[in-house]
Amino acid sequence: MPRWEIRLRQELRRVYQFDPFHSGASEMAQWLKVWPSLGATIAHGYASTIARFAEYIETRKGSVAPLRGVFTTAEKLYPQQREVIARVFNCRVYDCYGSSEVQNIAAECSRGRMHVNADFVVLEEDRAAGDRSTPRPLLVTSLWNYAMPFIRYRNEDCGVLLDENCDCGNNFPLMELNIARVSDNFVLPDGRVVR
């Protein structure tokens, strides 16, 4: 898809995209400069990138208008990241679980519990990988991708499916994501991040 078409689609959908792969201090300065003109109500993106942007804003004594929510994805959200994001953007932070192969596997509710998006995926524990005393590899079946379906795809993430209900009112199954795939981010001396 041509770049102009991507920009047009984003404009029509009122979406502004920051590039997480180019997120050094100079890029974040530009993000902070354009942020007020966006009228943003939510933010969605990599946990580490949003957390570093929040830290950037905070260390420069900047401020932004409160958001309705921040949705983190693609990486493990650590407690200290959740805290700085919530503090700077003055809103709840919701962690979402997905992968590049199958998006929208699960999302956190208002009670902080992870619900499987059962209208998009079937999520199973790999029973061949041992007993339930430890997290087991997850098998994901996409109900959304008709062109290239993933059926019982083992994505190397580990978790536990819970046999209980949540008092938030969402009846979708609960899960705990215990161990996700490992990836490292390296911060270069000039502030650029290598993923």
How would you describe each model-predicted region?
Residues 9-195:
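Active-site glycine/GP-rich loop and adjacent strand/helix microenvironment
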Residues 1-3:
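Carboxylate/His-rich catalytic cores and anion/metal-binding grooves
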Residues 6:
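Aromatic-rich, solvent-exposed beta-strand/loop patch
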